[in-house]
């Protein structure tokens, strides 16, 4: 059956800021308390979406979540009118106000894990929103994520949107940032690849400096609820040493697409066994795995973390050729730039490299791959997505003007205490739901 991979990028929200909330994410910690530019951040992401859509890739948009989250702040004991809640939180616990104000839902690679209909037992596309329970500012996202996905993918004959797994460390789930899929063609049955950082109920290596956010148990549970074929499901453990070096998700150290795995040599525990298992599973489905392994001598783990070489999008053009979408930081790192030049000239599976300015997102630890959720859809499934979320000239112009109207060009930590920011955000989101035709998506609209 004919199918295409669509990328749904998260629009950066109006409260985009640098609060250093993500322990284990080096860029996030390094830029803590610096001033952010939400308008620039949103436009950088929007331009990436538009350029990829112009190149013929299926490109969708996911709306931001409402921030600051008054629901969280009230749950934490702050009371009164909305402005009073914000003022009390700013005075008594500014770190909690920062968590409630984070625009981290922009990184939709963490929104959910998605299995296409070609892989599932019931022949429907399955979504499991990630519980993101390792970080407070992200653990509050999954309910709104489920609501958004249920709105966009509403046809129960074609789509299943599950609840998130129970938010406990034993089931820590970070979504598609630790998942990829290999296949001969998008519409054919494929091999789903889950990468975890630790296992809750069996002994094994674990990082010592930074936490492993994804558990084996969570990955297995997602695969089981999606009804995946066990012979086409592969699990691998991320090397704990690279987690300690700042690789907080697998998509910071490897990326896959169709029959290609682009990875650092230190990405996995027992890497050869991982490659062999993937190869055997993919062979059974009519494709041969191509592993492009980047040696540590050419690009160190530190180079990978600072440039986000592997937090790239690997996309297939209609003619089957592949393009690697990287942040401009890859061109600013001499080792990575030299490697990419050799890669493009090698006449291998990856024939082209596209470079984007995503500086505002990168300063919070999010590159091209963080900003998108991959959803493989057949023609009929795509037609069932009736909201105005597919990027084109008209939607781009509407969103670009919307950003100009509603977004600030500077937010410093102290600005989160401004009650006007809540009103500005709600006004913007209310208008956005009309642009995207998603109905009353937010609590304040209900």
UniProtKB/Swiss-Prot annotation:
One Pfam family matching this protein: AstB
Pathway involvement of the protein, from the record: Amino-acid degradation; L-arginine degradation via AST pathway; L-glutamate and succinate from L-arginine: step 2/5
Gene3D superfamilies for the chain: Succinylarginine dihydrolase
Top EC class for this record: hydrolase
Single Gene Ontology BP annotation: arginine catabolic process to glutamate
Gene Ontology molecular function: any one: N-succinylarginine dihydrolase activity
Intrachain disulfide bonds: none
Binding site for substrate: 19-28, 110, 137-138, 213, 251, 364
Catalysed reactions, as listed in the record: N(2)-succinyl-L-arginine + 2 H2O + 2 H(+) = N(2)-succinyl-L-ornithine + 2 NH4(+) + CO2
Keyword Hydrolase appears in the UniProt entry: yes
InterPro entries: AstB_sf, SuccinylArg_d-Hdrlase_AstB
Catalytic residue list: 174, 249, 370 (nucleophile)
Annotated keywords: Arginine metabolism, Hydrolase
EC number(s) from the headed UniProt entry: 3.5.3.23
UniProt keyword Hydrolase present: yes
Subunit-level organization: Homodimer.
PANTHER family on file: N-SUCCINYLARGININE DIHYDROLASE
Entry similarity comment: Belongs to the succinylarginine dihydrolase family.
Function comment: Catalyzes the hydrolysis of N(2)-succinylarginine into N(2)-succinylornithine, ammonia and CO(2).
Record's protein name: N-succinylarginine dihydrolase
Name of the encoding gene: astB
